Amino acid sequence: MFIMRREFPEEGDIVIGTVKDVKPYGAFVELLEYPGKEGMIHISEVTSGWVKNIRDHVKVGQRVVAKVLRVDERKGHIDLSLKRVTEQQKRAKVQEWKRFQRASKMLERAAEKLGKSLEEAWEEVGYLLEDEFGELYNAFETMVIEGKEVLDDLEISEEWKNVLYEVAKESIELTNVEVEGVIEMKSYAPDGIKQIKKALTTALKANPYEDVEVKITYIGAPKYRVVVIAPDYKSGEEVFKKVCEKAVATIKKLGGEGTYYRESKK
């Protein structure tokens, strides 16, 4: 069970829930992030335009993403809207909820290894990790990418650090990302092809990471495609910039011309 630090959502929040009941005038939604709390979607907030039959749009058991319009904590009333949520907000909330559920199970496994309850885990480390990393799953993911050291500045016991890192490595398999771009180079020297090859070879040595791969292929004069395969976009972008800047600097030093640019993967 997840214990929210806030008993009620706030006006403007995007929440996720399950439809528990549908009446002619509206639908009642169990809020998954706030156990024991229900919100109501009035028929006028289901969709834009006139709604003849609300059951054509909302069904019992349906998972919905809604925007909080009003909250009356004294009465326990929470008014929601479906029509005021964008498609992008829906996708983001569903993804956030899936990540949260997975992270919560990981935290529970870590707690079990220490003979603690999930509630104790949240109180001792869960909320702290959320505050530091933005969301719990991001904390576990960062541990896998950067190591247990990312927890060093936090007031977390060594036993918690060890077990959190252990569970993170057991649970998360990182998927590599690709960063692509193009280098354009020209050389006016008699041995211009040799100079361009030298610039590209030198550029490859600018990659400082063992877990990042760089591929450079010929497209057609004067273009060369650069593909950086990395565990995350941050290191991928960093290596792409280092490699391309090194290639351009080298060819210019040899009397040629060079430039580079990012290219979105189709």
From Swiss-Prot:
InterPro entries: NA-bd_OB-fold, S1_domain, S1_IF2_alpha, TIF2_asu_arc, TIF2_asu_C, TIF2_asu_middle_sf, TIF_2_asu. Keywords: Initiation factor, Protein biosynthesis, RNA-binding. One of its GO terms (biological process) is translational initiation. GO terms for molecular function: ribosome binding; RNA binding; translation initiation factor activity. The keyword Protein biosynthesis applies. Residues 12-83 form the S1 motif domain. This is Translation initiation factor 2 subunit alpha. It comes from Methanocaldococcus jannaschii (strain ATCC 43067 / DSM 2661 / JAL-1 / JCM 10045 / NBRC 100440) (Methanococcus jannaschii). The lineage of its organism: Archaea, Methanobacteriati, Methanobacteriota, Methanomada group, Methanococci. The gene is eif2a.
